[in-house]
């Protein structure tokens, strides 16, 4: 018989840097899950990734206090900032204050958008790479990036 699911926890955790402090500890603790077990398993799975890359994770909590987790691709904004060369670190660079109106914060090519779309395809809610490129193009514009051919 399958285990009974008691809930889901969605978090965005830096690769290789899961620890019991907030937001992980309180989110898992209130469901009665073993926080250190998750941290060790997550850090082991993300050991080969670039340290600090934000990884969206969905944790499924079961009635017997066990859990499973599924990792997604990093957010589109992370890939866009990386492609353009905006600072990614302790204090991430923000996009334009007035997207589409004021000065742009960088330029991105259609080829770079397609590359990002192919990476993100499993996580996006679209059927074709062209539709994924259109979604990512919209995110780029909203961040204040200029899309060039």
Curated annotation (Swiss-Prot):
Query: Which family is this protein grouped under?
Result: Belongs to the universal ribosomal protein uL11 family.
Q: Which GO terms describe its biological process?
A: translation
Q: Which HAMAP family match?
A: Ribosomal_uL11
Q: What does the PTM comment state?
A: One or more lysine residues are methylated.
**Gene Ontology cellular-component annotations:** cytosolic large ribosomal subunit
Q: Which organism is it from?
A: Methylorubrum extorquens (strain PA1) (Methylobacterium extorquens)
Task: List the SUPFAM superfamilies.
Answer: Ribosomal L11/L12e N-terminal domain, Ribosomal protein L11, C-terminal domain
In Swiss-Prot or TrEMBL terms, this protein is called Large ribosomal subunit protein uL11
> What is the top-level taxon of the source organism?
Bacteria
Instruction: List the transmembrane segments.
Output: none
Gene3D superfamilies annotated for this entry?
Ribosomal protein L11, C-terminal domain, Ribosomal protein L11/L12, N-terminal domain
Which Pfam family, an example, fits this chain?
Ribosomal_L11_N
Quaternary structure and interacting proteins, as annotated: Part of the ribosomal stalk of the 50S ribosomal subunit. Interacts with L10 and the large rRNA to form the base of the stalk. L10 forms an elongated spine to which L12 dimers bind in a sequential fashion forming a multimeric L10(L12)X complex.
The keyword Ribosomal protein is annotated on this UniProt entry: yes
Q: Which GO terms describe its molecular function?
A: large ribosomal subunit rRNA binding; structural constituent of ribosome
Gene designation: rplK
- What job does this protein perform? Forms part of the ribosomal stalk which helps the ribosome interact with GTP-bound translation factors.
- Alphabetic keyword roster: Methylation, Ribonucleoprotein, Ribosomal protein, RNA-binding, rRNA-binding
């Amino acid at each position: 018989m399958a285990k009974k699911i008691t809930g889901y926890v969605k978090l965005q955790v830096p690769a290789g840097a899961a620890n019991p402090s907030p937001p992980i500890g309180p989110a898992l603790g209130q469901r009665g899950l073993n926080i250190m077990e998750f941290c060790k398993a997550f850090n082991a799975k993300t050991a080969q990734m670039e340290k600090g890359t934000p990884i969206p994770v969905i944790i499924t909590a079961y009635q017997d206090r066990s859990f499973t987790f599924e990792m997604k691709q990093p957010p589109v904004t992370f890939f866009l900032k990386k492609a353009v060369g905006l600072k990614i670190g302790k204090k991430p660079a923000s996009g334009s204050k007035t997207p589409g109106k004021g000065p742009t914060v960088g330029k991105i090519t259609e080829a770079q958008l397609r590359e990002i779309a192919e990476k993100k395809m499993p996580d996006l809610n679209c059927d074709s790479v062209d539709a994924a490129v259109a979604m990512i193009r919209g995110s780029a514009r909203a961040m204040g990036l200029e899309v060039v051919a």
